[in-house]
Regions:
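Alpha-helical secondary-structure segments
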Residues: 43, 118-125, 150-156, 193, ...
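N-terminal lobe/hinge region of extracytoplasmic solute-binding protein
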Residues: 45-96, 127, 189
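Gly/Pro-rich hinge or "lid" segments in bacterial periplasmic/extracellular proteins
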Residues: 78-83, 168-221, 225-227, 235, ...
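Surface-exposed binding/hinge segments that line
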Residues: 94, 104, 137-178
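Ligand-site clamp/hinge motif
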Residues: 214-259, 383
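Structural transition elements
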Residues: 315-348, 363-368
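Extracytoplasmic/peripheral linker and loop segments enriched in polar/acidic and small residues
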Residues: 383-395, 423-496
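Long beta-strand-rich cores associated with HINT superfamily self-processing modules
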Residues: 492-518
Length: 518
């Protein structure tokens, strides 16, 4: 375990070769004497693990949730409704022109080591994230970021982006520029209401938080401490909430809901974006034909999957976005169970005798869906062999060769970064590894058409923007290079008699920014 007994920024002036060196240095200097907030210890049991602790390009469910508490962006998203609010920013961006904005930092903003947050830190954080493979697509609208002075940051954009600006700026979390990217992965330090005191994100590990005594922003810590246990096993998490050794449990297994409620906990389901999807190798026949791809979605009895495997806690797909999202539009092609339609499409595509396919299934919760999917596909003339394993994503990068798979079943949920349609579509359909490798869809005219529509929507607003997004949703429902089977409801359990102000969110992660111990 990496013990992060955090001290002054001077500790990080030189890069340490190992976590052990840093831990020893920290131990020698002693802990910062953080001022404590009133009110005991918030406890939680998390469902995901990670050993990458850096906020740069952070995409793990565990550490993204942790960064919401330890770091700040210029603006932050309220994950309960995806509204934005100023965090490190003193207020709204100052519009210089359609493609230039200035942001002033909050007076007195400090990191948990007591040092000031300055504009150079913001510039450094944005530049590192703009160069990051994960976040670069989210930030492609930015041409340059510069420090006007210690308190003011200037953003020059490549094109107008006003309607989405604040939510997208919230993706980047700010940290001291004097700390190297490598050291941020060992001893991360931020300006948020909480600071790490110990950090071990392995399965079976834990994260301890203490209040940042220097925090002067809108969401101060409301407890003396916070402790997260990491338990990927659903039974272990269930035991913790039932024994009341944890106030909050992430990712409740449907089979355990009754027992958890019987032990006195509240279980709350939230409609969200989380989804299992089919992804096709579109450079490989017959999956280069959209009629074949469409046949899969008619062949699968999704409602039966929802009823039998998901215990009813999912919603059929009517579009790329779920109906609960503000920008929902019912797509031109809504798939319902129709095996005869599937057979007809295969016949139209020249495969009247059916096709043989290997379905590569990720070995996580979607594996429970695979047997019924296999049976449904077989019945529609799509003769399916299952291969269930941990996906080796390194094999699925951009290549001149045909990638080594036919069709994949795996889950995803980029709504932890935001809920605007451009961000969500950019994740899977943008100019990145999902389309240059993986689905290999970026060689098609339809992909180019989608990029043009998305770019027009970025520069638009209001009804015009929504209409352009609607065209995108329609196109995706027709082409289905990668498309959801259903949108999943996420279940969180909590002890309402022990924690106040906690509200579950509809994506991975836990938020305690307004929660306190009763």
């Amino acid at each position: 375990m990496k013990d992060l007994t955090l001290s002054r920024r001077s500790l990080f002036a030189a890069s340490a070769a190992t976590a052990g060196i840093l831990a020893a240095a920290n131990a020698g200097l002693g802990k910062v004497d953080f001022a404590k907030a009133e009110g005991g210890t918030i406890t939680a049991t998390c469902a995901y693990s990670s050993t990458n602790y850096s906020p740069i390009g952070c995409s793990s469910a565990l550490m993204l949730g942790a960064t919401w508490h330890v770091f700040e962006g210029l603006y932050e998203l309220d994950l309960h409704d995806y509204t934005t609010y100023p965090a490190l920013a003193a207020g709204e961006p100052e519009k210089v022109s359609d493609t230039e904005y200035k942001v002033t930092l909050r007076d007195g903003a400090k990191y948990s080591d007591g040092t000031d947050v300055v504009a150079a830190d913001v510039v450094n954080a944005f530049e590192l994230n703009m160069a990051n493979d994960t976040y670069s697509a989210f930030l492609s609208f930015i041409d340059s970021v510069s420090a006007v002075d210690d308190k003011t940051v200037d953003f020059v954009l490549k094109f107008p982006f006003e309607s989405l600006l604040q939510g997208r700026l919230a993706v980047v979390k700010i940290f001291p520029a004097s700390i190297s990217a490598d050291d941020m992965n060992v001893s991360p330090i931020g300006s948020g209401p909480w600071a790490y005191s110990s950090l071990n994100g392995d399965d079976g590990g834990f994260i301890d938080f203490v209040p940042n005594e220097y925090y002067n922003g809108p969401k101060p810590a409301t407890a003396d401490a916070m402790h997260w246990d990491i338990q990927k096993d659903g039974t272990a998490r269930t035991t913790a909430i039932m024994a009341q050794t944890s106030m909050v449990m992430e990712a409740v297994p449907d089979a355990n809901v009754d027992a958890i409620q019987g032990a006195g906990a509240t279980v709350e389901y939230k409609d969200g974006f989380s989804l299992p999807f089919l992804m096709f190798n579109t450079k490989k026949a017959p999956f280069d034909d959209k009629r074949v791809r469409q046949a899969f979605f008619y062949a699968i009895d999704v409602q039966k999957l929802i009823d039998n495997v998901m215990a009813g806690h999912a919603n059929p797909v009517k579009s790329f976005l779920p109906e609960s999202f503000a920008n929902f539009h019912e797509a031109s092609n809504v798939y319902t169970y129709d095996p005869e339609k599937a057979k007809s499409l295969l016949s139209e595509a020249g495969y009247a005798d059916g096709i043989d396919v290997e379905l590569l299934c990720n070995n996580n919760w979607v594996a429970d869906l695979s047997i019924q999917i296999q049976n449904d596909l077989n019945a529609a003339g799509i003769n399916t062999t299952l291969r269930t394993e941990a996906i080796n994503w390194a094999e699925l990068g951009e290549s001149d060769d045909i990638l080594p798979y036919d069709v994949m079943l795996t889950p995803g949920d980029p709504s932890c970064f935001g809920a605007d349609p451009d961000l969500l579509m950019s994740w899977w359909y943008g100019d990145n590894v999902w389309t240059s490798g993986r689905s290999c869809w970026n060689h098609t005219e339809e992909w180019a058409t989608l990029q043009d529509l998305m770019q027009q929507a970025r520069e638009a607003s209001g009804d015009e923007q929504q209409e352009l997004w609607n065209q995108c949703f329609d196109l995706l429902s027709e082409e289905v290079p990668l498309y959801p089977l259903f949108h999943r409801q996420l279940a969180t359990a909590y002890l309402a008699d022990q924690i106040d102000g906690f509200v579950p969110i509809a994506t991975t992660g836990l938020v305690f920014l307004d929660a306190s111990v009763k």
